Amino acid sequence: MGSNITSTSIIFLLTGVPGLEAFHTWISIPFCFLSVTALLGNSLILFATITQPSLHEPMYYFLSMLSATDLGLSISTLVTMLSIFWFNVREISFNACLSHMFFIKFFTVMESSVLLAMAFDRFVAVSNPLRYAMILTDSRIAQIGVASVIRGLLMLTPMVALLIRLSYCHSQVLHHSYCYHPDVMKLSCTDTRINSAVGLTAMFSTVGVDLLLILLSYVLIIRTVLSVASPEERKETFSTCVSHIVAFAIYYIPLISLSIVHRFGKQAPAYVHTMIANTYLLISPLMNPVIYSVKTKQIRRAVIKILHSKET
């Protein structure tokens, strides 16, 4: 297109998985199955932590926050993805695109915040167990949750809102199955350096800082565990952190890999970028319920109790 277009009049076209449009129906089958599994798993854990008195403890409150965040992320991606794959509904208005982008970014940042809170929870439990209940009171946990929401809103709203100031004069085709912030900026014919700077600042100030603090927490946890005299005590103490470490790795390793591929894998086919991005948004919501059900005895018992009660 040769002339500038105001953002409010734009209709973007989402391609889904570029180059593999003919296989969208087949691609949708595993994505749909895994997404529904993630929805059911997180719903079950959230229901268990709410209804089972034995799970009314700080660790499980944070786990319920993680499940709620994963539910939001799964719903945000599933609706648009299946609309493209099953019904070929590819057009999305600029405002809808911004809303979609905001919720995906928001729940991604919220997940990072909750993982940081869970790392802090384990640090307090391991390093200062006698004061654990005094430090992580119900009111303080609620404050942490509210602070995480406010931080996400304050950091992400400018990043998304600044897209409104841009003019768009190129093709309005987004080679993705959802509104990906860097791809939307590429369609602009105006200077996007401010947008890029704000976006990088927002993500580093949230996900980047969280990553550093989580790593510091686990370094301190490991140092505390190694200082325990008895090997049995070391094993028991460290086992309480295993599920958190796995969840942390499952969230951050794909995120870092996606960033590396996006920055340095420009020669890779477009469908590779899209499939990696879609998989990244799915893997944490899918795996977190599995990790905590397998590694946490109390969660496993609560889930089994709920399932048995429904059968009877």
Curated annotation (Swiss-Prot):
SMART domains, A to Z: 7TM_GPCR_Srsx
Recorded family membership: Belongs to the G-protein coupled receptor 1 family.
Biological role stated in the UniProt entry: Odorant receptor.
Protein name, as recorded: Olfactory receptor OR51C1
Cross-referenced CDD domains: 7tmA_OR51-like
Chief localisation class: membrane
Species in which this protein is naturally found: Homo sapiens
One Pfam family from the record: 7tm_4
